[in-house]
Every structure is written in structure tokens, then in C-alpha cells.
């Protein structure tokens, strides 16, 4: 007989691999994860056949987020937020390259993997080698960016690990600058928009000032995520708060699966937006190719 969900512990689960580190509580995982996503099919299977244009994914290489109370949250990129949008893009015909800041392996929140979702699992299996041995972002900038680059979009998935390092990276800043200067897409969701903070590094104002975005609600990270034991403490800073201070317009204060297009910036509010953001990215990229 299955355990009643209300009997599940709201205490974060210790991660024995690190001192004072914790995974989300059993109760929080019962609320936030599921064996399947809302994937309802690919709209443009094989639509892109030329083989030139690719996606550059900037993924997380650090697992632990240090919190205000000294505890660490054991996190990574959220597998649905990473793999479901990529499923749509890859099925449409776009190849994907994976990069991390230092070239170290990508970290995933495997506890959020929808183990019965064929779209997500098949994409994970196709990308597993690249996730284990990603490119170093600085090398990508040096050798593969420029006006003639084959990358049509930069994709930054979420998961709380996106708040570690990526928001303070000059390499991420250079990559976003390149995308803006060369009319390429920037696609991100949930906590991934933390990367957009790099656009304001050492500048009087962000190059993304005035853009509108969807992002994971600060109110959940300050409230419910702590109350149900998803987080073992308060984050040192909040993504939507800092984006707003840089002059971006956060359009949501809840988690509904909302997506948004502002020029070439495509954003989603949470894992719930993964499916629709993937569709949006494919549609926008195909339209851009037709108009080139």
C-alpha cells in the first residue's frame, strides 16, 4: 500500500556526499515531480534539414548552492527544463552543443527526472556523452562565435544550479553580447534567467534593460519552497529581484507554465513551461531561417 502523501517528511534529505548539504524533502518531491511531463508531440519533426544551424546550451557544472544559513542545496539543472525544450529542437532538426563554464561535466537533478517520459529520456540518452564531456565556454567563444557562427540560439536551462557562477561569468556575458549583436535567440526558463544578470556585469546598465521576461517566482523561493523542505534555507539572492534591479521587466509572480517572447529573448516561468517553450523556440527559429 502506497504511503499517504501527507505522511511524507517535509525535512530536506541529507546529501551524504557533502557536509551540511541537502536534497529536497520527500514531500516536496511528491508535489514538484512526476513520472511524465505534459509533452503532447512534436509539431515540426524534421522541418529543418540543412544542417548548418545549431543550439548552444550553457549548462551548470556546480551542484551545490550555499544558502544564508550555511547549509547547501544539492541541485543541478532541472532535467525537464533542459531536455524537453531540447527534444523539440532536436526533433525539428537542430543539433545541440553543450558547454559549461570550465568544461566540467553537467550536473542534473536526477531526482526530478520523469522516468516514464519517453521524450525526455530519449533526449537524455542522446545527449549523455555531451553532458559528461561538454565544451569549455571560453573555447566556444574563441573558436565558434562570431558573425558567421553556426549557432542560431543560446539555451540556458533552469534548476537552482543556474544561480551559481553563471550570473557572474564574463564568458556568459560575452556569449549574450554576441547573441544580441548578431540577432540570435536567447532561450531560458525558471532559474535559468539568472544568466541574464551577466549582461550587466561591470556596466552602468544591462544590455537587456527594458526586456520583459518570465522567471521562477521569488515568492516561492522565499516561502513555500522552504516551508515544504524543497530548499533547506533561504537563497542569498533572488533572481527576479536582481533582474528587476537591472531594468528588466518580470511579467509573472506565479508559476503557471507561462512563456514569453520579447524580440529574440524567449523565456518560461518554470518546469511547467518546458513543453511550450520548446515549441516556441522551434517556431521562432524556423521562421528566422525562412526570413534569412
Swiss-Prot record:
Organism: Staphylococcus aureus (strain MSSA476)
PANTHER family recorded: PROTEIN/NUCLEIC ACID DEGLYCASE DJ-1-RELATED (PTHR48094), PROTEIN_NUCLEIC ACID DEGLYCASE 1 (PTHR48094:SF20)
Keyword set, alphabetical order: Cytoplasm, DNA damage, DNA repair, Hydrolase, Stress response
Protein name (record): Protein/nucleic acid deglycase HchA
Gene that encodes the chain: hchA
Record-linked HAMAP family: Deglycase_HchA (MF_01046)
Catalytic residue list: 190 (nucleophile)
Pfam families per the UniProt record, alphabetical: DJ-1_PfpI (PF01965)
Any coiled-coil regions, as ranges: none
Family the UniProt entry places it in: Belongs to the peptidase C56 family. HchA subfamily.
InterPro entries reported in the protein's UniProt record: Class_I_gatase-like, DJ-1/PfpI, HchA, Prot/Nucl_acid_deglycase
Regions of compositional bias (Polar residues) in chain numbering: 1-12
GO cellular component, one term: cytoplasm
Function: Protein and nucleotide deglycase that catalyzes the deglycation of the Maillard adducts formed between amino groups of proteins or nucleotides and reactive carbonyl groups of glyoxals. Thus, functions as a protein deglycase that repairs methylglyoxal- and glyoxal-glycated proteins, and releases repaired proteins and lactate or glycolate, respectively. Deglycates cysteine, arginine and lysine residues in proteins, and thus reactivates these proteins by reversing glycation by glyoxals.
GO process annotations (BP): DNA repair; methylglyoxal catabolic process to D-lactate via S-lactoyl-glutathione; protein repair
Species lineage: Bacteria, Bacillati, Bacillota, Bacilli, Bacillales
NCBIfam families per UniProt: PRK04155.1 (NF003168)
Protein EC: 3.1.2.-, 3.5.1.-, 3.5.1.124
The keyword Oxidoreductase is assigned to this record: no
Amino acid at each position: 500500500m502506497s504511503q499517504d502523501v501527507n505522511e511524507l517528511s517535509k525535512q530536506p534529505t541529507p546529501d551524504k556526499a557533502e557536509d551540511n548539504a541537502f536534497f529536497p524533502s520527500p514531500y516536496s518531491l511528491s508535489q514538484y515531480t512526476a513520472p511524465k511531463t505534459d509533452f503532447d508531440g512534436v509539431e515540426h519533426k524534421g522541418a529543418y534539414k540543412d544542417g548548418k544551424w545549431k543550439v548552444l546550451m550553457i549548462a551548470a557544472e556546480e551542484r551545490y548552492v550555499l544558502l544564508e544559513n550555511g547549509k547547501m542545496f544539492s541541485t543541478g539543472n532541472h532535467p525537464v527544463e533542459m531536455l524537453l525544450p531540447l527534444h523539440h529542437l532536436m526533433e525539428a532538426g537542430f543539433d545541440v552543443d553543450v558547454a559549461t563554464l570550465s568544461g566540467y561535466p553537467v550536473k542534473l537533478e536526477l531526482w526530478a527526472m520523469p522516468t516514464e517520459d519517453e521524450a525526455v529520456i530519449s533526449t537524455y540518452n542522446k545527449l549523455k556523452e555531451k553532458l559528461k564531456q561538454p565544451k569549455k565556454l571560453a573555447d566556444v567563444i574563441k573558436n565558434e562565435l562570431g558573425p558567421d557562427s553556426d549557432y542560431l540560439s543560446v539555451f540556458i536551462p533552469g534548476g537552482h544550479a543556474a544561480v551559481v557562477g553563471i550570473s557572474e561569468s564574463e564568458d556568459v556575458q560575452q556569449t549574450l553580447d554576441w547573441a544580441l549583436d548578431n540577432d540570435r535567440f536567447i532561450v531560458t526558463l525558471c532559474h535559468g534567467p539568472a544568466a541574464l544578470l551577466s549582461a550587466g556585469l561591470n556596466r552602468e546598465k544591462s544590455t537587456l534593460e527594458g526586456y520583459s521576461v518570465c522567471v521562477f517566482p521569488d515568492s516561492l523561493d522565499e516561502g513555500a519552497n522552504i516551508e515544504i523542505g524543497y530548499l533547506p534555507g533561504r537563497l542569498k539572492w533572488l533572481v527576479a529581484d536582481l533582474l528587476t534591479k537591472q531594468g528588466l521587466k518580470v511579467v509573472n509572480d506565479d508559476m503557471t507554465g507561462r512563456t514569453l517572447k520579447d524580440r529574440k529573448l524567449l523565456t518560461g516561468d518554470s518546469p511547467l513551461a518546458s513543453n511550450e517553450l520548446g515549441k516556441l523556440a522551434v517556431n521562432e527559429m524556423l521562421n528566422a531561417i525562412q526570413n534569412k
